[in-house]
Amino acid sequence: MFPLTRIAAVLLSLTLPLASHAALPDEQISASINPELAEHTKHFAQKVYKIADNVYSAVGWQLGNVAMIEAPEGLIIIDTGESVSESRKIMAEFRKITDKPVKAVVYTHFHPDHINGVKAFVTEEQVRSGEVQIIAHETLLANVVAQGALVGPILSVRSGYSFGAALPATDHEQMNAGIGPLAKAEASTFIAPTLTFKDKLDTRIAGLDLQFLHVPSEAPDEIIVYLPDNRVLISAEVEQGPTLPNIHTLRGTKFRDPVVWVESLDKLRAYRAEHMVPLHGRPVSGEQNVEEVLRMTRDGIAYIHDQTVRWMNKGLTPDELVEKVKLPPHLAGYTPYLREYYGTVKHSVRQIYNGYLGWFQGDPVDLDPLPPQDKAQRLVALMGGREKVLLAAGDAYLKGDYQWAAELSGYAIRLDHDDPLA
């Protein structure tokens, strides 16, 4: 194994959720779940979609899709999923279509659900010998190493926490991950890229013309692939799939600049593609349909950004901004692409504020606040003690006031992490 590949593979394994479960089968979804969320799960039913004569997308096996291009002289695999075992199942489905050899693999960006499953499709020996190329942006390997080396352990914890990875797949717990089925966490089989580029790359692979373009958005090293012969746009996560884009991800990330993301979406619109293949969710066909999805997505991101900046400059703090900035009905109702299955308006607003102004909101009390446990102890005493706090929390829960119930219980938990009632 190449030295950097070995390091990167270890680091990638640190950024995966600590546990994962299979997606909940449709027949096990009961009426207790939100009907819209139940309907959303159906977007990720396992299926290999044929988009054009030579382009296929495998949806529903794992969090990330895998796309296959059948070129005259061999196959080009776009992204590899997070799970080598699930990706082997996908490759078995592809083998029902063609027996051509794999000639190239493309990593659209450095996130684990797009690069970890590569050895389901190729071996290190094939890459080392030059039989197979691995194509990516020139910064991908540095991003893999930097993320894992610096914050890999905590990203793993936060990723598992934000995805609810320890919860069982039931109608009361987990159903889907918003952009796909629940993640399948496995050790990474990452192999380093052999061909990289900076801004754009027009090339011929396995007898087929391909155009690559760097379009920073959901990731700083995001690239898309365009097939001019049949006007197919493989949009990576610039168009993130059936959800409001997550301008901020709860697991933690560097600032995702909404202005840059909007510019990248406009670059995709300029292709006037007949087909679009995102790497999460189903493909979109028809030039007008592709244009509508891209335009509405860019309008949604632009609106959130512009209104946040507008009210930020009027002095509103993040807690005030999240109550002020709302998508208008024509955007909020654009199902599924602007619904809050993965990204949310409130999370995005806080990210934008922090990206421009940092953590300080202007209240001097926040410069040196009381430690959380000290604050909880004083507030619980002020409210009459633990029993009264928990009674109030229980009453709020029974009334459906779940946020207040959680906040009250949080004070008791800060005093005693093993408090079973809290």
Predicted feature locations:
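Metallo-beta-lactamase
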Residues: 24-25, 50, 75, 82-84, 142-214, 260-272, ...
